[in-house]
A protein has these predicted regions:
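Active-site neighborhoods and metal-handling regions in enzymes and metal-associated proteins
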Residues: 1-441
Length: 441
């Protein structure tokens, strides 16, 4: 079985000490053991947020030109953040109360909710050019006034498009509802799907994005360690574990915690992907799936399976070890294919046959997906379609890859997931929480 796919340069020995120092030649960002603090310092160049903002916008505008887009109109909160680096809480992400216009050339314009939100944006975003933060016009839930308000929103967008002289060009949209679509098309705009350009930009990470993903993975690893060695005990409820993870990860710098899946005993088969108030019993297998937004908006999403009592010496049964090895081996077989020049087909061929094959749809269980400032960035891999429609894997993509022993009639089962950077030399596993020792022998 594979245990680590970190691949550095050829061995390089320091003649004075005999130590292998090859890791010093590799990029800092590619090494999960070399991590910057979340804070800033005068003596070390850590995450450079000005560079992060500029490189994200540059990548996005380059992809827009590939698709011949004069501008993008963004409604999804994560896309607005990617383009403008504005953030005012996760609650605003997907309710269409703010938007941004990004021209293929020039500075983006942010439309922020009026009132104190608008005032805060003008204070918090000095990198936005003067006049490029404006009041958003909301239209959803405007009972009796939806067409009127959507029309005003469209007018505000058109004003920016005319300022950049792109109103006659193709305008990409990432996500919108029917009233907004109708209002924009009523102005004669050539509306096209803008998501492919956004996706291509976001799935390939910048150096600073990789450093932030590394920070997020370190917080997730620490939370998993706490679960295994401190919190997981007979008589504890699944939701108690979830609550402790929330508190711990927020204290360590996460912005927001999504649902933490804690499935124990019979809740692992069939697998219930949420936590309940069920008591965890000694000997239960416990699947924990951590989904959280780490420092500056970058995700951690990974899974471990524990044995309740394992930290106190209770061993897995031979059947449980076999299931764990099955999942581990299929996951790492897929990980080994995450290298530049391969395709998504190379990865999913290593996944077990499952309901993705049976129903030709994604179960999100034998699966890999790009992660970044959202849990699902832009590339999913599944046996449902990836073998027939392969997509290229590129350097600096970052994936969560997960497999599952989803056999029928099991009393309990296992599931695992890792977070992996695609480096020039192959896959680098960023999630470092150890696996069950007896299953690794």
């Amino acid at each position: 079985m594979a245990s680590d796919f970190v691949r550095w340069n050829e061995r390089k020995v320091d003649p004075a000490t005999g130590m292998d120092i090859a890791f010093l030649d590799g990029p800092h960002r590619n090494n999960p053991r070399r991590m910057y603090s979340q804070t800033g310092a005068d003596w070390q160049m850590r995450v450079d947020f000005d560079r992060l903002r500029k490189e994200r916008l540059k990548k996005l505008q380059a992809e827009m030109k590939v698709d011949n887009l004069g501008a993008l109109v963004l409604f999804a909160g994560a896309n607005i953040r990617y383009a403008t680096a504005s953030y005012q809480g996760n609650w605003k992400y997907n309710i269409n109360i703010r938007y941004a216009v990004v021209p293929a050339e020039g500075a983006p314009t942010l439309f922020e909710t009026a009132g104190s939100d608008l005032q805060c944006a003008k204070i918090d975003l000095p990198w936005m050019e003067p006049g490029r933060i404006r009041p958003a016009v909301t239209w959803q839930w405007a009972e009796g006034a939806v067409p009127f308000m959507a029309g005003r929103m469209a007018d505000s967008v058109m004003e920016v498009l005319k300022e950049h002289k792109v109103e006659k060009e193709q305008i990409g949209i990432d996500n919108l509802d029917m009233p907004a679509f109708q209002a924009l098309t009523n102005l004669g705009l050539k509306i096209v799907n803008g998501w492919p350009a956004v996706s291509r930009a976001r799935v390939v990470k910048t150096p600073d994005e990789i450093e932030l993903l590394k920070q997020a993975s370190s917080i997730g690893d620490a939370a998993m360690w706490k679960i295994k060695y401190e919190w997981l005990k007979p008589g504890v409820r699944e939701r108690e574990i979830e609550a402790k993870v929330h508190e711990f990860m927020l204290e360590r710098g996460c912005e927001i915690i999504y649902d933490i899946i804690v499935a124990s005993g019979g809740n692992t088969s069939p697998y219930r992907r949420w936590a309940t108030d069920k008591l965890i019993r000694q000997g239960d297998l416990v699947i924990v799936d951590i989904n959280a937004v780490g420092p500056s908006g970058y995700f951690i999403d990974f899974v471990r399976c524990f044995k309740c009592g394992g930290a106190q010496g209770m061993k897995m049964t031979p059947k449980e070890i076999d299931l764990y090895k099955e999942v581990y081996d299929s996951m790492y077989a897929g990980i080994e294919q995450l290298k530049p020049g391969n395709t998504t087909a190379d990865v999913v061929k290593k996944f077990p046959h499952y309901d993705d094959d049976e129903y030709t749809t994604v179960t999100l269980q034998q699966f890999a997906h790009s992660i970044g400032i959202t849990l699902y960035e832009g590339m999913w891999m599944s046996r449902a379609y990836s073998m027939k429609y392969p997509a290229p894997i590129k350097e600096n993509m970052y994936f969560a890859i997960e497999t599952f022993a989803g056999h029928p009639y099991l009393e309990m089962t296992t599931r695992l997931e890792e977070n992996v950077l695609v480096s020039a030399n192959g896959p680098v596993v960023f999630t470092r929480m150890e696996h069950m020792e007896e299953a690794m022998k």
